[in-house]
């Protein structure tokens, strides 16, 4: 079992790389933020309804010598999402990674799910992730070093559970979107890669958010992996 990544204030070697993490203020997103910081990334932390939490985390990183920025945007609205990515690029001068951790999950019985519920899940979980990746990828294409896109999905799309019909429908689009982005960006710059992490760490008794963060680092750092969906679920489907 992986131990949480070491985070020693003042001891981080900066690499000049910059990452944007949507939904980075708590949970898996915050673990990804800390993991990226431990690898020398400057980090932009996105939040919407909980921007203050993102600011607190950004302040903690700054105190440890990590360049950081708290940003906000409603992921349902294309314009603000594009403006957020542009702000990150303007602030740091580049974008090397984007990790889309933000998602909503409204649980409830199938008979109570409305078309509006479904649209809301797709707008945020798919539309917001797509626009953030599309906009950030446009910056990466222009960089000789390229960059990495990580879409966060849910491994439960292959073994659905009750009460999550709208959420899992939106998550089912993530693998296809990842593969499409991988092909599209590689046609412009083969150093721009898009991959997906299918996480169910929270549903496994030994799973932690750090396990997911380690997978994100692996996919970002391996330059020869593109267009895959990596399950991080403790072998759940084999049980």
Task: Explain the meaning of each model-derived region.
Residues 150-173, 178-187, 200-204:
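Catalytic loop of short-chain dehydrogenase/reductase
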Residues 133-134, 179:
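A short, exposed helix-loop element centered on a Lys and neighboring polar residues
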Residues 41-55:
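Conserved glycine-rich Rossmann-like NAD(P)H-binding loop of the short-chain dehydrogenase/reductase
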Residues 16-17, 66-67, 94-95, 140-154, ...:
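Active-site loop of short-chain dehydrogenase/reductase
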Residues 25-26:
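Conserved glycine-rich cofactor-binding loop
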Residues 208-232, 237:
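C-terminal substrate-recognition "lid" of short-chain dehydrogenase/reductases
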Residues 109-110, 117-122:
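Substrate-binding pocket helix/loop in short-chain dehydrogenase/reductase
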């Amino acid at each position: 079992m992986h131990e949480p990544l070491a985070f020693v204030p003042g001891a981080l070697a900066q690499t000049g790389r910059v990452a944007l993490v949507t939904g980075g203020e708590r949970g898996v997103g915050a673990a990804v933020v800390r993991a990226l910081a431990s690898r020398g990334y400057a980090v932009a932390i996105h939040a919407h309804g909980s921007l203050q939490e993102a600011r607190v985390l950004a302040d903690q990183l700054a105190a440890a010598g990590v360049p950081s920025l708290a940003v906000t945007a409603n992921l349902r609205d294309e314009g603000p999402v594009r403006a957020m990515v542009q702000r990150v690029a303007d602030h740091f001068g580049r974008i090397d990674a984007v990790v889309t951790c933000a998602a909503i999950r409204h649980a409830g019985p199938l008979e109570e799910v409305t078309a509006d519920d479904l649209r809301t899940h797709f707008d945020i979980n798919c539309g917001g992730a797509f626009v953030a990746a599309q906009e950030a990828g446009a910056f990466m294409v222009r960089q000789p070093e390229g960059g990495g896109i990580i879409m966060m999905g849910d491994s439960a799309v292959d073994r659905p559970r009750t009460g999550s019909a709208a959420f899992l429908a939106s998550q089912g689009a993530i693998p296809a979107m990842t593969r499409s982005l991988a092909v599209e960006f590689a046609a412009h710059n083969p150093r721009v890669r898009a991959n997906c992490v299918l996480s169910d760490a929270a549903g496994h008794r030994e799973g932690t958010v750090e396990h997911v963060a380690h997978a994100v680092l692996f996919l970002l750092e391996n330059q020869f992996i593109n267009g895959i969906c990596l399950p991080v679920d403790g072998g759940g489907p084999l049980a």
